[in-house]
Amino acid sequence: MWMIFSGLIVGGLLGFVMQRTRFCLTGGFRDMYVQKNNKMFYALLIAITIQSIGLLILTATDILQIPAHSFPILGTIIGSFIFGIGIVLAGGCATGTWYRAGEGLIGSWIALVLYAVTAAITKTGILKPVMDKINQPTNVNSDMSQTTGIPFWGLVVILTIITIFLVVRTLNNKKVRVAVPKLKQRYTGIRYYLFEKRYHPFIAAIVIGLIALLAWPMSASTGRNDGLGITTPSANLVHFLITGETKFIDWGVFLVLGIFIGSYIAARVSREFKWRLPDKITIRNSAIGGICMGFGASVAGGCSIGNGLVETATMTWQGWIALASMIVGVWTMSHFIFVRPMKKVHQQSAKVKQQTQIV
């Protein structure tokens, strides 16, 4: 009962907060390249930093132990790159797909189902030999503290200093802001703050970092010594639905179900829930994106949450290499979907303008 309750609570909080704050790593990584806007990436660093400080305290007081492990460096790079491509096509990362499904987006449902099914096939099905072939000969020590000689607390201090510097610089950057007309306020009191008010990404990141930290002791109390994770629980849910075997049900499964429920509640009460049927191109992209996400995250040993938020906070090479690789994947696909079409439009506009001047 505790496993069900704690998993749903943590997942519900995460889904609720992400839906209400529109916390989207896919959009953040894309904007770094397309719009030269790093704000969401810095928000991710805030969440990682908060979690890492909390883990430092929990491990120093022997409340929690983070076991060292090796990781497949080639698989992490290749898998994360493919995952990055997939999340652009799908319009959201693993967590983003779960919470957008809770908003009624059919495209996210398509991506979510294929993501979970592909992850299951890759981890235990016909694609497992492919994953093993990529990963087998490339295992190296993932512990940054052991490989660099810098203690865990030292790495946390370095990350904290870098994050504070970037956040302060961003907040002090006085850019000219375009006045955006505000909609009439619908709610008052706590309902306004929970279901209407929009929050700065940095505020959202603080809350998400605390939720990510809370996930560790909650998960450990059920025998799962890990933090937030999306891919394996999603695959386990598929296995359970197919086989009916309860061995696939653990804290992580209730976590992802909680994300969906929390997002649904937030979208319903804030009147943002709506069944939305995408066009044919979006359906195609969502399907391909979901498949890439499931395969890539399985090969890499984690998604934008498992690797990008959790493994980075534990100061592992797997986390930081995966994060860099998935960002490159996002940039690569963003170039073909957003940047190149925009360049063509600008070139055509310039050509028309030139012809007009000649006439």
PLM feature segments, named:
Residues 1-359:
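Membrane-interfacial helix-loop segments of redox and metal-homeostasis proteins
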